[in-house]
Amino acid sequence: GEQLCRLRAEFQASRYLTEERRTALARELRLNEAQIKIWFQNKRAKIKKASGVKNALALY
């Protein structure tokens, strides 16, 4: 729903959240910070997997 749309929009703006941003989002969406952190980690992993990157270090 609305939370998911907000998370996706935030992810499009930046794949990595600052601690301040994560805290603000958690408050705004009434989720805990761990949930948001994990959602972002999973989203990054899905994109990496979809792009066929075999070695995570290849991105750096």
UniProtKB/Swiss-Prot annotation:
Keywords: Developmental protein, DNA-binding, Homeobox, Nucleus. InterPro entries: Engrailed_Homeobox_TFs, HD, HD_metazoa, Homeobox_CS, Homeodomain-like_sf. GO terms for biological process: neuron differentiation. Disulfide bonds: none annotated. GO terms for cellular component: nucleus. GO terms for molecular function: DNA-binding transcription factor activity, RNA polymerase II-specific; RNA polymerase II cis-regulatory region sequence-specific DNA binding. PROSITE patterns: HOMEOBOX_1 (PS00027), HOMEOBOX_2 (PS50071). It is found in: Nucleus. Its main location: nucleus. Residues 1-41 bind DNA. Belongs to the engrailed homeobox family. This is Homeobox protein engrailed-like.
